[in-house]
């Protein structure tokens, strides 16, 4: 019993180091002990956060960027966020660590963006929708809720008897460091690019979660390399000697 208690104590310390701000939040709230319930919550939260109507679109309208030529510049900078391929290549624990670290950087960047947003009274005078500002202000509480569930899932996985080999996460690729801008307009564009990348990242996160198994001991592997090997095994030469046509390829 003493050995088991010591192992659990060490586990709690490790989780607190990996998810420092989440440990206190989980103490206030409660972690679900049901893996499927917790996974379902994570999937719903990521579905919510990849929706551009909740963050990027309101930001574009408030900042006066809702013009086709300006929208073209709202594209994620390459390497700003971890790619889907990188996320799929991680073990589940490494994936959760990377997700948690990246969201921590996102929270800092959102705080910076909020400071540069116009006030509610200024929006009213400009005839803009105050609801857009309210949506932007809800982004940070939503991320905190997601990080709480990430901590709970990490705790649940480490309490299970899963023997999945863990690949170390690379952590956040430091998405959100604002580049020096010469004027306010450039800062608006930087914020727009950041939010575009954030939504893309959350879409990738949702796709990874969708490949997780129905129990903490079973996970449908989300590695693209295994999917490639399966595709090779399923490929059969045509009996009529015709060339195989890959999906999406138009006939000549």
Curated annotation (Swiss-Prot):
**Signal peptide position in this chain?**
1-25
This protein's UniProt keywords: Cleavage on pair of basic residues, Cytokine, Disulfide bond, Glycoprotein, Growth regulation, Mitogen, Secreted, Signal
Q: Where in the cell is it found?
A: Secreted
Q: Which residues are glycosylated?
A: 100, 217
Q: Which GO terms describe its biological process?
A: immune response; negative regulation of cell population proliferation; negative regulation of hormone secretion; oncostatin-M-mediated signaling pathway; positive regulation of acute inflammatory response; positive regulation of cell division; positive regulation of cell population proliferation; positive regulation of inflammatory response
A Pfam family hit: LIF_OSM
Membrane-spanning ranges = none
Q: Which GO terms describe its cellular component?
A: extracellular region; extracellular space
What GO molecular function annotations does the UniProt record carry, in alphabetical order?
Answer: cytokine activity; growth factor activity; oncostatin-M receptor binding
**Stored InterPro entries:** 4_helix_cytokine-like_core (IPR009079), Leukemia_IF/oncostatin (IPR001581), Leukemia_IF/oncostatin_CS (IPR019827), OSM (IPR039578)
Post-translational modifications reported in the UniProt record: Propeptide processing is not important for receptor binding activity but may be important growth-inhibitory activity.
Where is the stretch described as Disordered?
162-184, 213-252
Q: Where is the composition biased (Basic residues)?
A: 218-245
Q: Which residues form the propeptide?
A: 222-252
Please list the disulfide bridges: 31-152, 74-192
The job of this chain, per UniProt, is described as: Growth regulator. Inhibits the proliferation of a number of tumor cell lines. Stimulates proliferation of AIDS-KS cells. It regulates cytokine production, including IL-6, G-CSF and GM-CSF from endothelial cells. Uses both type I OSM receptor (heterodimers composed of LIFR and IL6ST) and type II OSM receptor (heterodimers composed of OSMR and IL6ST). Involved in the maturation of fetal hepatocytes, thereby promoting liver development and regeneration.
Family named by the database record: Belongs to the LIF/OSM family.
| Name of this chain's protein | Oncostatin-M
Q: Which organism is it from?
A: Homo sapiens (Human)
- Give the encoding gene's name: OSM
């Amino acid at each position: 019993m003493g050995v088991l208690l010591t192992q659990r104590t060490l586990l709690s310390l490790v989780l607190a180091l990996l998810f420092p701000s989440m440990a206190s939040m989980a103490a206030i709230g409660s972690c679900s002990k049901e893996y499927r319930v917790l996974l379902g919550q994570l999937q719903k939260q990521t579905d919510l956060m990849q929706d551009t109507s909740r963050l990027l679109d309101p930001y574009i309208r408030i900042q006066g960027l809702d013009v086709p030529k300006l929208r073209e510049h709202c594209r994620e900078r390459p390497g700003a966020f971890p790619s889907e391929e990188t996320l799929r290549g991680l073990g589940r624990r490494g994936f959760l660590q990377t997700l948690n670290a990246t969201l921590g950087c996102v929270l800092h960047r959102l705080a910076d963006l909020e400071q540069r947003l116009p006030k509610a009274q200024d929006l009213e005078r400009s005839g803009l929708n105050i609801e857009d500002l309210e949506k932007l202000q809800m982004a940070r509480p939503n991320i905190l809720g997601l990080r709480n569930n990430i901590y709970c899932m990490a705790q649940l996985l480490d309490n299970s008897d899963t023997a999945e080999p863990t690949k170390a996460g690379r952590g956040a690729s430091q998405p959100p460091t604002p580049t020096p801008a010469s004027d306010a307009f450039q800062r608006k564009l930087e914020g727009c690019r950041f939010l575009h990348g954030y939504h893309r990242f959350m879409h990738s996160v949702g796709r990874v979660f969708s490949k997780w198994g129905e129990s903490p001991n079973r996970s449908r592997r989300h590695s693209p390399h295994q999917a490639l090997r399966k595709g090779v095994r399923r490929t059969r030469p045509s009996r009529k000697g015709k060339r195989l046509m890959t999906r999406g390829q138009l006939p000549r």
